[in-house]
Amino acid sequence: MTMVEHYPFKIHSDFEPQGDQPQAIKEIVDGIKAGKRHQTLLGATGTGKTFTMSNVIKEVGKPTLIIAHNKTLAGQLYSEFKEFFPENRVEYFVSYYDYYQPEAYVPSTDTFIEKDASINDEIDQLRHSATSALFERDDVIIIASVSCIYGLGNPEEYKDLVVSVRVGMEMDRSELLRKLVDVQYTRNDIDFQRGTFRVRGDVVEIFPASKEELCIRVEFFGDEIDRIREVNYLTGEVLKEREHFAIFPASHFVTREEKLKVAIERIEKELEERLKELRDENKLLEAQRLEQRTNYDLEMMREMGFCSGIENYSVHLTLRPLGSTPYTLLDYFGDDWLVMIDESHVTLPQVRGMYNGDRARKQVLVDHGFRLPSALDNRPLKFEEFEEKTKQLVYVSATPGPYEIEHTDKMVEQIIRPTGLLDPKIEVRPTENQIDDLLSEIQTRVERNERVLVTTLTKKMSEDLTTYMKEAGIKVNYLHSEIKTLERIEIIRDLRMGTYDVIVGINLLREGIDIPEVSLVVILDADKEGFLRSNRSLIQTIGRAARNDKGEVIMYADKMTDSMKYAIDETQRRREIQMKHNEKHGITPKTINKKIHDLISATVENDENNDKAQTVIPKKMTKKERQKTIDNIEKEMKQAAKDLDFEKATELRDMLFELKAEG
């Protein structure tokens, strides 16, 4: 058993909260202390929401889970929080699959697709680091994607199976080795890696699953632990002496031997009942398939203690009743903790939708004899269960969704940007002669070396408009969903560099389109109500022009819809608040100068002057060149992950998939 140690949260920053940040921090902190369950931070683009969240965590002093809606965003937040809290445990918990094809069955073609996955070892290490941190200290911030609501092993079992070693403790070497094997560590004296241990005489070296380069050297003197040291596993350099060390299990799905026996009996009983059911329905093929697959898994469990796809038996392994709520990362937090949901208008619907998608796929597998019905219990949480498990939540969004609005009695607003930048001016113009009018507006921006985003409603309109603009001599490109990640990043970069002056697209709300050079956003068909022209989408689109001090938005429409009116009024309200603040403090709005990164690059061996020259990937390559480029990108991706630059690593990974697919 390990004791949770107490440490205060300490922020490292050159800045103090300013603008309306102090007020927002105070309101949220007071709300949490008063026991409020739901609060929403309505933070406009560029107002420093992350800094506000950090200050709230520091004041409240509770372990905190921050959920983002994708890995890229989680990686970005992880880097930012790590900078703010270098002395505290900031952890990263996302799906460890670089690539994941879940097992599935297509009845119409009688095709079974085996589970195929590539696990990222570094992310697996970070997941172990996150869960073990929660049992070691209370100053923990975990940045997670929605994968935190997926099944994980029993936290009590995980905690109880910790192997605790202490100097002076009576324990012989073979007892330690036995305990390590029980928690799924394997002995490997040659290939020493995470989750293994090696033995040299009276010295046992253990590579914990939660560590990256650090192993633990335990030295014995007879039946007593004589010395414990932290060692660099590569160089053998001793880093520090330890009095005590807790070794957490190498897997989150770890089960004691006596429990495994009970679990196997339960699986056999369920198999017997299910086979009878299938045979009674004359589904003989399905029955044979299920019997064969399950018996193979059971044999593996008896011999090895685990099997491939063991998570499908999690309800039995944790001895829970069928249909009960699975254990997830949320259960690893204690009783008093905090949840923050970033971009909640996107993240909450994602949390809500996870269960149904997963259920539909697994039901087909169960119906056709690929899995036992209990496999349905290896699932993400239902939304109601998520609500039940979370005690206090802070939603963070520039455009809160219906759930947040319904559950929060009063929004905590953060409208003022420390940079003084105002929300853009909005003008509504009639659709008559809109294209000629648009061209003259673009011309004005081009002369000032500024960029333009144009959003349309249909793919055809985007294509036609792009062609028309090209014929009119405008440097324009078209961004649509079929464009690969690689090209997409390249197009945005080229817009910033001035290769293009205009980008035309349908949904320009995806992350990565915050471009300070954009001074004009044009919304065509603004009066056509629908998902892309809802008040939330309009406010988000308008926000794309809020990073430039000359930011303007033109909506072409023949009538004023409720969504337009709301978006215009809200933008004007925020604009006035910022203007008053600027006037009071003598701030002059200034466009943010954001460095243009060359992400579309593969590190290549180049001339002596340039150690890390980066080349743009050529469009046509020989097989040999392609392989060399793939190797280079892979190297760069691993380096980026090591440097905790997950945003870059994710983009490089997507590039890698595309290059491999093209090969």
Curated annotation (Swiss-Prot):
Name of the protein described by the UniProt record: UvrABC system protein B
Keywords (A to Z) from UniProt: ATP-binding, Cytoplasm, DNA damage, DNA excision, DNA repair, Excision nuclease, Nucleotide-binding, SOS response
Classification via SMART domains: DEXDc, HELICc
Its biological purpose: The UvrABC repair system catalyzes the recognition and processing of DNA lesions. A damage recognition complex composed of 2 UvrA and 2 UvrB subunits scans DNA for abnormalities. Upon binding of the UvrA(2)B(2) complex to a putative damaged site, the DNA wraps around one UvrB monomer. DNA wrap is dependent on ATP binding by UvrB and probably causes local melting of the DNA helix, facilitating insertion of UvrB beta-hairpin between the DNA strands. Then UvrB probes one DNA strand for the presence of a lesion.
Listed GO MF terms: ATP binding; ATP hydrolysis activity; DNA binding; excinuclease ABC activity
Compartment(s): Cytoplasm
Domain Helicase C-terminal: 434-600
Residue intervals of the UVR domain: 627-662
Domain Helicase ATP-binding: 30-417
Motif (Beta-hairpin): 96-119
Chief place where the protein resides: cytoplasm
GO biological process, one term: nucleotide-excision repair
Assembly, per entry: Forms a heterotetramer with UvrA during the search for lesions. Interacts with UvrC in an incision complex.
Pfam families for the chain: Helicase_C (PF00271), ResIII (PF04851), UVR (PF02151), UvrB (PF12344), UvrB_inter (PF17757)
